[in-house]
């Protein structure tokens, strides 16, 4: 088997193919969809009087927050319009808790852990690893996480800080968590601790 794989690999090398297999990179046709946005004429001042060419408000442009509110079916007061990268927002959230979490910064914990459904996003695992946080796997099932396994895992006496997952079109399986699954996740997590952090990477929400 090993020799067969090596032979196939060498055969492909001999063809000197030039293929871009960068993961998650949009096709040119997809990029073209946004071309017209570059030429839009938009107001310079937001509806609450902020000059959009200047530094913005900490929670983001109010019109963008309202759009997020509609997409997420959540109050606009609960929406922050921040970076365009969900991974960066995730990193910043973990960094702030690592340094300043109350009542104890995560950096002061001996064995901090995070729940990570698998299969999952390798960059989530690497991000946690960079902070010395152990990623503890639980299984994905048809409609979301295995809630029984989730409950058993976080109640094993260890220092679980939260869960990091992709509830909508989960990477890489494509699983979408049901409303019932997410509600059960919230119930279990909050019963464990009111400090338990639910980090939903909604990169594929739309």
Where are each of the predicted segments found?
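N-terminal "arm"/small-domain region of PLP-dependent enzymes with the aminotransferase-like
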Residues: 1-59, 63-70
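Conserved core of the PLP fold type I
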Residues: 50-194, 205-206
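Hydrophobic "anchor" residues on beta-strands that sit immediately upstream
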Residues: 197-198
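Walker B catalytic acidic pair
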Residues: 201-202
């Amino acid at each position: 088997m090993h020799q067969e794989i090596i032979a196939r690999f060498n055969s492909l090398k001999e063809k000197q193919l030039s293929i871009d297999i960068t993961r998650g990179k949009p096709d040119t046709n997809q990029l073209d969809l946004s071309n017209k946005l570059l030429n839009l004429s938009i107001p310079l001042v937001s509806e609450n009087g902020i000059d959009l060419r200047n530094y913005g408000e900490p929670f983001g442009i109010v019109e963008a927050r309202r759009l997020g509110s509609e997409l997420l079916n959540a109050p606009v007061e609960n929406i922050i319009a921040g970076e365009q990268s969900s991974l960066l927002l995730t990193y910043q959230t973990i960094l702030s808790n690592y340094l300043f979490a109350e009542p104890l910064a995560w950096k002061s914990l001996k064995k901090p852990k995070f729940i990570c459904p698998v299969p999952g996003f390798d960059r989530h695992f690497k991000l946690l690893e960079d902070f010395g946080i152990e990623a503890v796997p639980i299984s994905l099932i048809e409609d979301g996480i295995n809630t029984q396994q989730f409950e058993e895992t976080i109640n094993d006496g260890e220092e679980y800080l939260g869960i990091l997952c992709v509830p909508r079109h989960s990477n890489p399986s494509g699983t979408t968590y049901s409303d019932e699954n997410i509600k059960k996740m919230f119930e279990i997590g909050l019963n464990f601790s009111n400090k338990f952090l639910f980090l939903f990477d909604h990169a594929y929400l739309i």
